[in-house]
Amino acid sequence: MSVNKKVEIRDEFITLSQFLKIVDLVQSGGEAKSFLLSHKTLVNGESEDRRGRKLKRNDHITVDGQEYEIC
């Protein structure tokens, strides 16, 4: 899997909602909920629609074909 963008975190984990805000795909948690229902989002190859999903280092996220890695 080729990763196009790396997202660095300071804490042990971030939520999927926080991730979407960091990469400027949404502005708020409510917007994240709607976004996840209408955009194909994968975490480590599995479909995900929970905005509270914890993302840790080395997780791979794909949003509408754009790939990211948490580091």
Task: Mark where each language-model region is.
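A positively charged, amphipathic N-terminal helix/segment that binds anionic biomolecules
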Residues: K5-K6, H60-C71
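A short, structure-level motif marking secondary-structure boundaries and short turns
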Residues: M1-S2, V43
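A detector for short, charged/polar N-terminal pre-domain segments
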Residues: S2-I14
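A basic, amphipathic helix-loop patch mediating RNA/tRNA/ribosome contacts
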Residues: T15-R57
